[in-house]
Amino acid sequence: MSTAMPGAFSPPRGLADLPLCPVYSRLGRPFHQPVAATSLPEPRMVHFNAALAGELGFGPEAGPQLLEILAGNRPWPGYASSASVYAGHQFGAWVPQLGDGRALLIAEVRTPARERVELQLKGAGPTPYSRGLDGRAVLRSSIREYLASEAMHALGVPTTRCLSLVASPQPVARETVESAAVVCRAAASFVRFGQFEYFAGRGQTEPMARLADHVIAEHFPHLQGHPERHAAWLGEVIERTARLIAQWQLLGFCHGVMNTDNFSVLGLTLDYGPFGFMDRFRWYHVCNHSDYEGRYAYRAQPEVGRWNCERLLQAVSPLLADAPGRAAEIGQDLLRRYASVYHRAVMRGWADKLGLREVRETDAGLIDEFLGLLQRGRGDFTRSFRLLGRIRTDSDAPARGVREAFADINAFDAWVADYRTRLRSEQNVDDEARAGRMNRVNPKYVLRNHLAQIAIDKAMLGDYSEVARLAELLRRPYDEQPDMEAYAAEPPDYMRNIEVSCSS
């Protein structure tokens, strides 16, 4: 039965008082078009993010009227929803027009912390950019996106957030018939590389400049008076992207669809589709079963990030200089930042994961040797790094309870000898303090694919308890949480290294 309230609609208490801040919406055409959401029959709240709701400035519970808004059955009070247009390179191939095919911007609000946040419904029905598709999302993929975005936030990775997950019995045809769902995503901005590519592909410099100036004014205000503001802004976008992908690598996270239309100009992890946290470490791990050539494999991600930044620079080159040759020179100078920023970020991150206070160039060999051990022995990425915190420098005894996790124990013991030597080379070695530091960067819990699948299977039967359990667990990924030990275990063999479909 629908939860729609009879008679006149009044906003949920507190929602009407939440100040709207319609900045992006005022850009109007050609950036986006007004689109109303398609009603979702019999909506049910699967999970509501009370913590994020508090940050946004309204209550910790979603009553029936708020549910209607988050299902797309009622508009946000005082705001007209819209869908944005963009283009992009998908698996390296240029696509001149894409766009929000099932996502609608439903509000821009000012939080109590004076931050502007955009709210977007994903799965809200068809838009002018749906390319003949139904504009819906399915429960399976929506659970994954909801849990992943909040898990990544708790891990300290820049990301879009999710406020709510709403399900419906409405059937949706994908590879099989599934049920519909809608997630409400939150971010400071959903502007993507592909929006600039769209206008570049049409030779429309004026709207591209307007969009760039909007992004700078709203999200990089310190650059507004800069004499070369567009170049300075692009430099910061490149650096944010490099640091973001370094964080992905350090967590064993594979995005799965690193198309330019899925890259945020704010350096946020955007669009959780066939993503995955690696179980057993493989340099060329591919999480998307549609990625036949491994374009977006784990090892390829840093270079893909650089390539995507190059496409952005190519698109906005008219904003850098009037002369194409000079614009290209500026772009190449900016692009060189990517490799150096990525290298510094990833080396600092690996050092932190090994408990090293200093970063030395010779540490690259130690890191590569450890990753080689994982690759050859099919070691679990997350669990192996967490176990390293147990190794002590005050003894040369075998690292019992750790070495057993490695297939080649002799090779591991040899590596540990080198590792202990490196740890002891730093002054004032304190094993307890080091273990504490390591446990703050090596998570115990990540959203493994098999855990998400268990929650999905239960939710499809109407049991949302596992979604709630995972949402709570993943809020504290670095804590021991002894009662949840089973969630840190490696997956059973039949659920290892699941590759996920793009179908969502």
UniProtKB/Swiss-Prot annotation:
The protein, known as: Protein nucleotidyltransferase YdiU
Gene this protein is translated from: ydiU
Source organism phylogeny: Bacteria, Pseudomonadati, Pseudomonadota, Gammaproteobacteria, Methylococcales
Pfam families reported for this sequence: SelO (PF02696)
Claim: Nucleotide-binding is one of the keywords in the record: yes
Function: Nucleotidyltransferase involved in the post-translational modification of proteins. It can catalyze the addition of adenosine monophosphate (AMP) or uridine monophosphate (UMP) to a protein, resulting in modifications known as AMPylation and UMPylation.
Residues that bind Mg(2+): 262, 271
Active site residues of this protein: 261
Domain of life: Bacteria
Cross-referenced InterPro entries: SelO
Family: Belongs to the SELO family.
Residues where ATP binds: 99, 101-102, 122, 134-135, 185, 192, 271
UniProt GO molecular function: AMPylase activity; ATP binding; magnesium ion binding
Reaction catalyzed: L-seryl-[protein] + ATP = 3-O-(5'-adenylyl)-L-seryl-[protein] + diphosphate; L-threonyl-[protein] + ATP = 3-O-(5'-adenylyl)-L-threonyl-[protein] + diphosphate; L-tyrosyl-[protein] + ATP = O-(5'-adenylyl)-L-tyrosyl-[protein] + diphosphate; L-histidyl-[protein] + UTP = N(tele)-(5'-uridylyl)-L-histidyl-[protein] + diphosphate
Enzyme Commission number(s): 2.7.7.-, 2.7.7.108
Segments passing through the bilayer: none
Cofactor(s), by name: Mg(2+); Mn(2+)
Keyword field: ATP-binding, Magnesium, Manganese, Metal-binding, Nucleotide-binding, Nucleotidyltransferase, Transferase
